């Protein structure tokens, strides 16, 4: 289930999977505030998602949620229509009600940050062991000798709303200059990156 956001990947998803698209009520109200990214209230969004489940008579064993604007309000409603919920989370400041929560950004010592924000029977999976990475990358021979490093790939996600990419480029250029190096930096930006042209002109 996916929204019809600008620069969405729905058509790509449809090449291999079934994709149920939801209309966005108010595209103009979407801004840097992650709570606006659904394009409407959580209540309206979850009702539409439940309608998809009912209309298509879907029997869902696992519902995987990957969206910054969704929290326990949405999950409490959908829980009645699915067997299990897995949440992919990058933050620790929202309440969730799920069976499994994955946060690859923190380590085990930081799980305490979820105190009072997660149901007690939730399995919390954190750290690099749960890194969501294409299996092809795991098959690569990683060169751990930094001194021989010649090329670095930079990618900060599809939208990079805070333009971290440009900040990293500046740091990389400074590092090259200060250390008299000639490391090549390949920069990748997503279609929804509003600073794409600015970044392109910079490099």
Predicted segment positions?
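Conserved nucleotide-sugar phosphate-binding/catalytic loop shared by glycosyltransferases and other
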Residues: 2-51
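Nucleotide donor/acceptor-binding cores
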Residues: 61, 149-152, 183
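A nucleotide-sugar donor-handling region in carbohydrate enzymes
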Residues: 97-162, 190, 196-197
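A conserved mid-protein helix/loop that constitutes part of the nucleotide-sugar donor-binding site
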Residues: 159-173
